[in-house]
Amino acid sequence: MAPGEKIKAKIKKNLPVTGPQAPTIKELMRWYCLNTNTHGCRRIVVSRGRLRRLLWIGFTLTAVALILWQCALLVFSFYTVSVSIKVHFRKLDFPAVTICNINPYKYSTVRHLLADLEQETREALKSLYGFPESRKRREAESWSSISEGKQPRFSHRIPLLIFDQDEKGKARDFFTGRKRKVGGSIIHKASNVMHIESKQVVGFQLNFTLFHHPMHGNCYTFNNRENETILSTSMGGSEYGLQVILYINEEEYNPFLVSSTGAKVIIHRQDEYPFVEDVGTEIETAMVTSIGMHLTESFKLSEPYSQCTEDGSDVPIRNIYNAAYSLQICLHSCFQTKMVEKCGCAQYSQPLPPAANYCNYQQHPNWMYCYYQLHRAFVQEELGCQSVCKEACSFKEWTLTTSLAQWPSVVSEKWLLPVLTWDQGRQVNKKLNKTDLAKLLIFYKDLNQRSIMESPANSIEMLLSNFGGQLGLWMSCSVVCVIEIIEVFFIDFFSIIARRQWQKAKEWWARKQAPPCPEAPRSPQGQDNPALDIDDDLPTFNSALHLPPALGTQVPGTPPPKYNTLRLERAFSNQLTDTQMLDEL
């Protein structure tokens, strides 16, 4: 290396280097504190006095801790995917209303099919629970038909068995007393008999849509989706809603199927299936039932904010109902699918899945036992339907307020019942009784709709703005300050550490690869200063100050040579001698 390059390298080495190229972390931190835009870090360096510097260190560390705490809260709030709710009020259309009679079939139509069942039931109840007659008479009259050799047709088809809790899987025949092994339950097959009830609409001269329900027979839906236009009302109150007088016909109630009298009503969307048996409201006879509605429409956010579905396409359960998706439809479809898989047939109260048949005792004699076992597992959430089915993200819910009043009153029934009987004409062959009638009023309490809409409480933009607010509040930082912090603490900081480690690794590798060199000969020494080594570089002032003093006791190895040129001789010495000699002569 040339002498000039060596001098330049030594000067560069001795000069202090700051900034990102600083050789140590201490110098880097000092440079950052002096040049950063944040206030606290600079005050730590420029403050004079130990107490003041300690105070600024405490203030700065406290501010940093508060920033980290607030930012952590913001991050946690962002990832909790919370929502905010906005409530709006607006007008909506009139909903669909489905009305069903509690009694599904006319008793006069199916009575001849149940004659044997009725007679044998009376005899069984008489033998089991007894009547006011004496015990001997009851025992003498019990099952006299059996002693005469008459076999009941109903018992011949379906045996009457007595089950004991201590003997599971076994039962005793009620007539013969013999024990039988039982693997399921058997009931009579239902007949396809439908009962159509008359209706009277007051205020709305419109036709109702017939709807057959498997549990309640013929039902009627008002303002259904099959209509050309969906009806709406322009005012709220009981006078501007649906008013219906229902003919219940209590005499035609089947005592073996129902034990109460009245009707059921359900309010739902036009594209929604009416689950009357689940959420229906019962209407009492001889009463006027007023139902005030208040509509709430909800819109929920899907993943990741909630476990809801938009249209049920992401739910692995096939919708067997001809209606829009809902949680109830999914649960019933799941149960019916499990019923077909495990029992081999479908339950009659729900729609039929593709390539399946309804259960009957000829082809599936043990289907009832399988049904009850499956229903018990469904209620205990062992089938997995509750975990698979999701709630709909958007749905409508009507909040109902029900009030009752006696109808018709004692004073008005004298003229009202004959008028209603005359209005029915040939459809009713008897004089109406008030227990055969029920009046229903359905109306909006007000025409305002409450809409509940979910929106993300924390978005990316709001998270960044909250970060900026916290940094600006506690340390007067901006985006530029954040970039400086990232550059110094996450780039330059680790770059210095990496350079130092790399330099150490190179030196270690060079020492390991270099061959062992012999001992260097003693460097030549000067005569006047034997400690000074001969170097190609020119001496500098700093290097001269660091040299050790010359040793005074050390004698040079060889005497200095005698040079004639160094001897001083006067040119006129001989002449002076000659002159002196001439004078002497």
UniProtKB/Swiss-Prot annotation:
Domain of life of the native organism: Eukaryota
Disulfide bonds: 100-219, 308-393, 330-389, 334-385, 343-370, 345-359
Alphabetic keyword roster: Cell membrane, Disulfide bond, Glycoprotein, Ion channel, Ion transport, Membrane, Phosphoprotein, Sodium, Sodium channel, Sodium transport, Transmembrane, Transmembrane helix, Transport, Ubl conjugation
Region of interest (Disordered), ranges: 513-534
Predominant localisation class: membrane
Keyword DNA repair: no
A biological-process GO annotation: sodium ion transmembrane transport
Entries under NCBIfam families matching the protein: ENaC
Family: Belongs to the amiloride-sensitive sodium channel (TC 1.A.6) family. SCNN1G subfamily.
Subunit structure: Component of the heterotrimeric epithelial sodium channel (ENaC) composed of an alpha/SCNN1A, a beta/SCNN1B and a gamma/SCNN1G subunit. An additional delta/SCNN1D subunit can replace the alpha/SCNN1A subunit to form an alternative channel with specific properties. Interacts with WWP1 (via WW domains). Interacts with WWP2 (via WW domains); inhibits the channel. Interacts with the full-length immature form of PCSK9 (pro-PCSK9); inhibits ENaC by promoting its proteasomal degradation.
Name of this chain's protein: Epithelial sodium channel subunit gamma
Gene: SCNN1G
